[in-house]
Amino acid sequence: MGTIIDSHFLAFTALVTIAYQFLFFVVTALLKFDKVTDFAGSTNFIIIAALTLVIKGSWYFRQIILTLFVGIWGIRLGLFLLFRILQWGEDRRFDEMRSNLGRLAIFWIFQAVWVWAVSLPVTVVNASDRNPFLQVVDIVGWILWAVGFIVEGTADQQKLHFKRSSENRGKWCNVGLWKYSRHPNYFGEILLWWGIFVASTPVLKGAEWLVIIGPIFLTLLLLFVSGIPLLEDSADKKFGNVDGYRIYKKRTRLIYLLNVIYLFGLWLSRNVSSPSAMSRLLLFCH
């Protein structure tokens, strides 16, 4: 089993992620400086993708494209979050963690798991010796990534511009994409990582299909744990007594995801619903 894990760079990327996140944990714990937290997460994705591509050395077109996708996403998001927190001056998520080393450690452990798990599709593709011809599913995955990337970037900039305006102080963002969804940035992030998974499927074989854990983990994380629930609670505390906000919340979708899940379910049923394909998906090793 160790050979199988190492041949897919799973142990290697786990060690790299643990070391990288531990470094920033030490900085945060000793200096009480938490402004690099999101930057540490975003750049860790880039490091994993780049290292696995270079170490394997195959340089297949599909590997290069997916690595570039991760790099472009990580650079944009990492710099955006870093500049934003430097402007705002504090990260309220850590208000109760700065003096509690145990809770702070749990956060960084969870971030390491997040990075490693979500990176699984790219990690396995970059570790693979298989290089099938480009297929329609590759293009579909690239389109999903592009749409998700544009949506996330646009939503981030729209909200940042909204909050910078003194006229909008004390208001919730309801312009641009935020007029149609309460969390369009998270929709974009979920979509682009599902796109990366879809584009990785031509390479996957047997137990490698378990990399679907990556986008599933991200989706559940943002929907039910650390993403949307925290922001919804914060907004409810700030604007819960405002009639306009209650109307906005009632009329505006949380996230445009159900239609995407339905379409992906159709695709998945056509590609892995046969007995042989499902058996490959459920195999733990091959």
Residue ranges of model-derived segments:
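A basic- and aromatic-enriched beta-loop-alpha substructure that forms the phosphate/nucleotide-
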Residues: R62-N100
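Transmembrane helix irregularities
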Residues: L30-L31, I75, I109, S181
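Hydrophobic transmembrane alpha-helices
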Residues: I5-Q21, N44-I75, V118-Q158, K163-W267, ...
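Juxtamembrane helix-capping/reentrant segments at transmembrane boundaries
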Residues: L31-F45, G89-F107, K171-W178, L254
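C-terminal ends of transmembrane helices
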Residues: F22-F33, L79-I85
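Select subsegments of transmembrane alpha-helices in polytopic membrane proteins
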Residues: F39, R103-V115, R182-E189
